[in-house]
A protein has these predicted regions:
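Histidine-centered active-site/metal-ligand motif
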Residues: 175-177, 228-229, 350-352, 370, ...
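Carbohydrate-active enzyme catalytic cores, enriched for enzymes
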Residues: 220-369, 420, 522
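Aromatic-lined, polymer-binding surfaces characteristic
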Residues: 84-264
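Long, acidic, intrinsically disordered low-complexity segments
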Residues: 32-52, 66-98, 173-191
Length: 549
């Protein structure tokens, strides 16, 4: 059971408006408005093919979400025994715009008609605001892409938009409120008339305020998850797309397009900075492959919409000061460093206790990776994946650097100190263990050099049972080559050599979750700090060879 202290440390960061909105959301139960749908707006400009995901409708009535396939005849639309996130995905209709969608048009129409029959307005998970928002957008995209529009589908779209306009998630804010607003903009542009204009005005007003708050100066989405950042960028690109396609002359939407395009460019730069050379996102906070479109697909979509962005330096250090991340590229190495706060104080639901963690690639091979995310909800696995031990950083006295609990809650939060960049050295500290006796502070310094990286950790004052962890990517083999020395191999190819210069180290089994529903075996180097200090030296290329012979 959660203690009073943890609960207070969690709720005291909420905005008063969130608390009031939650009460209003629970108490106010509007009735669905079943009036006929407004007329449809004709296309004015070109409609660009949106970013596509992998297919999720894998056969008639067979759906694949989160790497788990089910038959709709067996599971139904809202089985409470099935994970909530899987049920949410069931109601999104992402497959309408997925890879190879046209080949499944027949079974897609059957599924859509079945949804209308089995999910009456305002009933069940499918009518919660978040799935309603994503479904409105997906249906409109599909129809704008040329799918024949049936009257029943258009009518349901209008009913959903009316319902959503009364169920906006002001109590959650963040990405939920943004996609609520995006859906209203989509409905407001797809339909004509006074009612549609009201949806449009409501959506645009929210987006105007939230875009300024949620996109930081360096382009990061403020929850600081590369996965949710990619989703937010997709949202903004979708708004650009429908604005160009449906906004009539004189519409206020046309005046917003330049700002949306500039903001999307900054967001694309941040996404590029937080990607590994293999093209995929880094695993910071809640992050997994297969939820957002691939970075390559987002790049394609952005280019077709005329979005331009800077390219990260091929050689050098790129501090993303507003969000708190650092990209380092030197020789074959690319490192992503986390010196960031865990997220907005009032919205830390997707945060992990990963402060001062990092990831490392050599060429297109990931070498050091954080633990990833395989699940949401309330489970020991969820807590494990959010905890400090699943990340490449220091854990003090068995505690988490930020007090993660439940599925999406955080009590005490680590606060990073000043980020310092000196030549090829990056250093920072945090106070996430300030509640322990002596209020210990963890400081970390990354010193990059030709063919190597020196990681120095200090915890002062020193505390017993303090360890640094380095989680190796699945598929790599790590073997001891001497006292305090290990060789890292990809198959029979040597990648790197690791020497623990200060501290007592051992190799332990580990787990990595690159996608929801996927957990892979891996290895982890665990370094026990000596007198509050650990120094770990990583070498690669010819430098690694000279150390390992």
């Amino acid at each position: 059971m959660t203690g009073v202290g943890t609960f207070w440390r969690t709720v005291r960061h909420l905005k008063p408006a969130q608390v009031l909105a939650r009460l209003r959301f629970r108490l106010h139960k509007p009735r669905p408005d079943l009036r006929p749908a407004p007329a449809r707006q004709a296309l004015i400009g070109p409609w660009v093919q949106p970013a596509a995901r992998d297919a999720s409708l894998v056969g008639p009535g067979r759906l694949l979400f989160l790497n788990l396939e089910r038959d709709l005849n067996a599971c139904g639309w809202d089985d409470p025994q099935i994970e909530k996130l899987w049920r949410y995905n069931l109601h999104y209709f992402d497959d309408l715009n997925a890879v190879g969608s046209a080949e499944r048009a027949g079974i897609q129409r059957v599924l859509l008609d079945r949804w209308l029959r089995d999910n009456p307005p305002a009933s069940g998970t499918g009518w919660e605001p978040y799935p309603v928002s994503l479904r409105i957008v997906n249906w409109v995209k599909w129809l704008l892409g040329g799918a024949p529009a049936r009257d029943a589908w258009r009518h349901s779209l209008a009913v959903q938009a009316r319902w959503l306009s009364l169920r906006l998630e002001w109590h959650l804010l963040g990405n939920h409120l943004f996609v609520n607003a995006k859906a209203l903009v989509f409905a407001g542009l797809y339909f004509q008339g006074t009612e549609a204009q009201q949806w449009l005005q409501t959506g645009l007003a929210i987006i105007d305020r939230q875009l300024a708050e949620q996109v930081l100066a360096d382009g990061a989405q403020f929850e600081r998850s590369p996965m949710y950042h990619a989703l937010a960028l997709e949202d903004l690109l979708d708004l650009l797309n429908i604005g160009q396609a449906l906004a009539p002359a004189g519409s206020v939407v046309l005046t917003l397009l330049p700002n949306w395009r500039e903001t999307a460019g900054r967001m694309l730069f941040w996404l590029r900075c937080m990607a590994h050379p293999d093209g995929g996102i880094g695993f910071f906070n809640d992050a997994a492959h297969g939820i957002a479109p691939s970075n390559a697909e987002i790049e394609r979509y952005a280019a077709q919409l005329g979005v331009r962005a800077l390219v990260p330096m091929q050689e050098g250090i790129t501090p993303l000061m507003a969000s708190g991340y650092v990209r380092v590229a030197r020789g074959p190495a690319v490192a992503l460093l986390d010196t960031a706060p865990i997220g907005p104080d009032y919205l830390p639901g997707h945060a992990h206790a990963d402060t001062l963690s990092f990831e490392l690639s050599l060429g297109i091979q990931r070498v050091v990776v954080n633990g990833g995310t395989s699940c949401y909800g309330l489970s020991a696995q969820r807590l494990l994946e959010r905890g400090t031990a699943a990340h490449n950083t220091v854990q003090v006295a068995g505690q988490d650097s930020s007090e993660v609990w439940s599925g999406f809650r955080v009590g005490r939060r680590a606060r990073p100190g000043k980020l310092l960049v000196d030549g090829w050295a990056v250093s920072c500290s945090h106070d996430g263990y300030r509640h322990l006796p002596g209020a210990p502070v963890h400081s970390r310094r990354w010193q990059f050099e030709d063919g190597g990286l020196l990681v120095q950790d200090v915890v002062a004052p020193s505390v017993a049972k303090t360890v640094a962890r380095y989680h190796f990517a699945p598929g790599l083999t790590v073997r001891a080559t001497g006292a305090g020395a290990w060789s890292v191999m990809a198959g029979d190819k040597p990648l790197a050599h690791v020497t623990v210069q200060t501290g007592q180290a051992s190799l332990m089994p580990s787990r990595h979750a690159p996608q929801f529903g996927v957990v892979q075996s891996a290895q982890c180097l665990v370094v026990n700090l000596t007198d509050g200090r650990a120094t770990t030296h990583w070498r690669w290329g010819t430098h690694a060879h000279s150390l390992s012979v």
